[in-house]
Amino acid sequence: MDVGIINYNGGEELTACVKSLLAQTVPVRVLVFDNASTDNSIQNLKKQNLNCFIIENGENLGYAGACNGLLENMNADIQVLCNMDLEFDPTWAEKLLNCFDRHPEAGSVASLVMEKSGVVNAVGVQFGADLFAKNEASGLNIAEADIREKEVFGCYGAVMSFRKVAAEAAGKMDASFFLFFEETEWYFRHNLAGFKTVFCPEAKVYHERSMTTVRYSPRKLFYSERNRLRTAVRLLPMSDVFKLPFRGFVRYLSMAKGGVPGQSGDGKKLSKISICKALAKAWLQALWMLPNELRVRKEYHRKFENASLKARKILDAYSLNA
């Protein structure tokens, strides 16, 4: 098993993450891809003299770019991409490999990502009609969540475990997404290529950062919405694409009724104007990128038979309203 960590200013959390992987009950090969960090996380890691392969990049390629860089340096049949702010249960790799053995039909196995308090980060992913994605069971106590071993849409982006053959069939992540929704678009391609994901509740990973650190942010909103729209144009039936403005407006209205938070996850003041600007920028950029997305759509429809029909079935199978 090869495990690749994406690092950007990970501080001491990076070293802790590497140590938890090297402490597994089965051997794993650990790689670290540094996205031009400005802190001392890589220097501190080197001082520990740990058995890991470090790739230092001169510029920040974003999450997807770093994932692609790691994939180019991985050779194992089972591969993992993950954030640096994680701590892996000592039996995680063993449980994960056992699940892969039990499910030879699965291209990926999703871990149970949770806080040490027992709050779940994600079990799977569910979708709204406009491709709005929500992590299944996010924020629930583990006693309240459905954590049966079951088929899910794909892995939570914090830690993705997959067979090499599945990643090769899906192709590279789209580095132009930079942040957010890139793993969702990628896992649509996994599904379209015929590779399913099984959720393994025994494979436990602890997410050290509270989810609130990234929950409300105009920057996150911009990238999430822009990349959601780009993915919708690439994959959904055109009848659904034409409905995106209306469905998006309905969702924004529903969210607005719930109230706008007073501050973002990093404690900065958050205004309705900043949210509206982020949404407007996302839609304008998505519109500007439309010619490119239509070209990608043609490529996907050539590569994956009945791509739009299959994408529609995926939405129905993992619907928020199910």
Where are these regions (language model features)?
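Short, acidic, metal-binding catalytic loop of nucleotide-sugar glycosyltransferases
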Residues: 19-28
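A conserved acidic beta->alpha catalytic loop
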Residues: 20, 34-43, 59
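Glycine-rich, basic loop-to-helix element that forms the pyrophosphate-binding segment
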Residues: 56-74, 84
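Short aromatic/hydrophobic "clamp" motif used to bind/position activated sugar donors
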Residues: 79
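Conserved donor NDP-sugar-binding/catalytic core segment of glycosyltransferases
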Residues: 87-128
